[in-house]
Amino acid sequence: MVIFKKFILKISSLRFAILLIIFIAISSGVGTFIPQGNDQQEYIDFYNETPILGFINGSQVIRLQLDHIYTSNWFLFSLILLCISLAACSFRRQIPSLKAALKWTDYKDEKKFYKLELITNYEIIQDADHILKADSLLRKKGWNISKFENRLSARKGLEGKLGPIIVHIGLIILLIGSAYGNFSSQSKEQYLRLGESLDLINESTNSRVKIKLKNFFIERESDGKPKQFISNLEFFSKQQNLNEIKTTQVNQPIRFKGLTIYQADWSVSNIVMEIDSVLYQLQLKPIPEIGDQIWGLLIELGRENKKNYLLTIDNENGPLKVSNIEDFSENFVYLNNNPIEINSSKLSLKKIIPSSGLIIKNDPSIPFIYLSFTLIIVGTILSLIPTNQIWILFNENTNKLFIGGLSNRNLLGFKKEFLKLSDEIKNN
């Protein structure tokens, strides 16, 4: 029991929580540096050649679970430990502080007033019930009052004591939601060509929705670099009597019935070419060896003496580069332009078909994340509210009225309010 109390005392300290948060933040940063969820052999091949920090090879990456940090045993343990730390801090510090604040403190002796941060007193000349008048004045200004025969206690801003507790609850929900999302979320990357559709099936409700790419276009900078990718998607379901078009672009996902659809990438997936009066739809593939965002394929051209040519394209408007892989000569074919002759074959580019790269993610932890951030924001705002207290005591022997005040924050602002209230009570 003693060991358990020492353990709770240790983990409920602010220093321990801060160190744990720093550890989790650094671990999350490492997770963005090291690709997550790839095949283990990829880590072994890559990090054996280029070890992390010069000494952590591929086998050690896997052994330390750095290939799946967010679902690793040690990362989840640190999240659980932080939840326990926050809960322990709430029960050891915040809740007792709230309970203490809910209890009225009664100052019967004027000597106690001199221990307060703010104090004033003055002699009563006229015969009047100043306690009753002070009670009425403070109630009108929104103070809560506990009144006795010759004294009263007043307080305002008690909701500020709830702020830290609400923040801790929000953080705990955030940690639990994040861990839940790491295990339960599903993600799929899908490229859709214009007019191509995809079925989305919700197994829990046995509902099916078809999405179809109606339009896709790229906004470019003045120098031709991509600025924004935009997809218009049609959502259709006879079962749900649904037919509507939604738009997604980078950093503006579509949220639909628990799914989130992100605009992630694009590609040139197909081209339609006429070669010697015959139409061909050719599928292109990325060629990272040549450069980023370059797609192409290898074909044979020529009626008798056939030669291999590499077709490449780097944007949705063309032109198409035709390269002879033997002598490296190049020709360009422009969209809907006159055909050109290469090795006795006539080529013309009829259509360029881009694809929209979408990431479709099902993350049931999203409601927990939104709830947690709402609680954290509300709790933070409440924490900014100062808790102010005022005590008033009338000494019948000396015929003096004592007024004292205390505030847990913004003492300078409360001092101005305190002096103003004191003058109003004196002149009331």
Swiss-Prot record:
Q: Which residues cross the membrane?
A: 14-34, 72-92, 162-182
Q: Where on the tree of life does the source sit, at the highest rank?
A: Bacteria
Could you tell me the membrane topology recorded for this protein? Answer: Multi-pass membrane protein
* Main subcellular localisation: membrane
Per UniProt, the keywords (alphabetical) are: Cytochrome c-type biogenesis, Membrane, Thylakoid, Transmembrane, Transmembrane helix
Subcellular localization: Cellular thylakoid membrane
Tell me, which GO biological process terms does this entry list? cytochrome complex assembly
Any one Gene Ontology cellular component term annotated for this protein: plasma membrane-derived thylakoid membrane
What InterPro entries has UniProt attached to this entry? Answer: Cyt_c_bgen_Ccs1/CcsB/ResB (IPR023494), ResB-like_domain (IPR007816)
General function of this protein:
Required during biogenesis of c-type cytochromes (cytochrome c6 and cytochrome f) at the step of heme attachment.
Spell out the family assignment given in the record's similarity comment: Belongs to the Ccs1/CcsB family.
Subunit comment = May interact with CcsA.
Q: What is this protein called?
A: Cytochrome c biogenesis protein CcsB
| Organism expressing this protein natively | Prochlorococcus marinus subsp. pastoris (strain CCMP1986 / NIES-2087 / MED4)
Gene label:
ccsB
